[in-house]
Amino acid sequence: MTSTESGTTYPSYKALLEREGQLAGTSWGLFPDAGRGTPSFIQPGSVRDAAGCVRTGTVFGLDYPADAFDPGMSLKRRAPRHTIYSAHPAHRDDFLDGYYLQGSSQIDGLRHRRADDVGFYNGTPDGDIREGTAALGVQVWAEQPIVGRGVLVDVDGYCRDQGTPIDHAAGQPLGLNLIRAAAEAQSLAFRPGDILMIHTGWCEWFLALPAGEKESQRDSRRASGIEQSAEFVAWAWDNRLAVIAADNFAVECLPPVPASPFRATAPNDHGMMHQQFLAKLGLPLGELWQLGPLSRHMKATGSWDALVTIKPLNITGATGSPANATAVT
């Protein structure tokens, strides 16, 4: 058990697994704001402490352009079409058509995934997850943005230093031991409420490919990312992470590793961890973040934390949103 500055006590992941019935392995009912999820780990004191991460006053936008991934890895999402129009010579206005809210840098909301075995987060009925309803929508994080200490683990840099660069074309799984080793090489210590950013180098690698090779990579359904394991899920919860974000397609690797322990409980996702994080723990995931410039700056300064803000679009009931994330070092 660990407690926050508000006095709220949270069990270990092992204890979560020992909860009864549908509650086993979930954080359902543990947070004061039922729809906020693990960003609840960020307390006012955490935000004040995060302000101490501002040392150089350098600001980084962590979102790629809305049309950056065209083509991208998604079989469905396309780049939006931007139209500018005028009512008279002194006026300009604009709109977007075909805007997929998770088509570029994004944050996955808690209604983005339903656990095959127990349903949506907090037992929210399936019928409540539709347009025009608020339950589990990203508007919760728009009305009270996620602001806290962001820590960047440069797995890409660590692997290069070891002489074993990540094989993005093969969709290399990145295991917990590797992520821990990279964090230890940076002398990183995690705190409750941290926003974890994992720099893999995947986005910059993918965006540098010719269009035809991007399409081939999309069709291969391979993307490097975190290896699926019960150990990683436990580690994320026990470190009280508020958000996990990465500069790759799905945070976790695709396809899921054959040994994924979630193949039986997440058959529709072929053993991905998305259901564990979103539907069971209430832990939002950030995907396709622009972390390269921030990582290079942090390496140059030797400081691997920053004040990070995440302000999704205020769309009631959205399943996800552009992350609208900023880091200040």
Task: Report residues per predicted region.
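Active-/binding-site microenvironments in catalytic and ligand-binding cores
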Residues: 2-329
